[in-house]
């Protein structure tokens, strides 16, 4: 059972990227990149995906066409989608090592963009003790409410914090608090009237199939096979 959440934009500049490089490349980047908008692609046809996934099919795996009305905003986990070459930079606003104040830093650009759907992904760089969760939620909520005031017609989705591998959690105990933080995120979304996207169910095989060597950052195929199809399905079915 999927739960809704959400979003971002990244300016794009000429850069030679090896899509297989993964986290090692992303870690070298300190800021996101933005590109001038290109002509709007033709709308994608909504068709059923194979029964084993339950996702709507993204026609011809054309993620740019599928996400033409969706903007994703977040940290390095979202920047990876651009760095891997899955989505163009104009659909993403992301940077390495940021937290929810990244929304405020890009506030004017996001408001000017006026996306139909906005997906927000923050928390991996902020997560700490359970006692620190309230401060994280308070800051995040304030940033979202500020956006809602200027973007009343934008549907906002908030991502859950991605789980990490058992090995990564054993090295950094704070990651054991991810479920608690996600509970707080779900409560926040319900309180302020935005969608919550809970990806926990997608990580059943994440340990062996989807992690980079650090056990924290997903590989390219996670975004192509799981994350983006799930986001697309949740948004299309909920519109």
Positions of PLM-derived features:
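Charged helix-capping and loop-helix junction motifs
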Residues: 133-143, 174-182
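A short helix->loop->beta-strand "cap" motif at the edges of active sites that frequently abuts
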Residues: 151-155
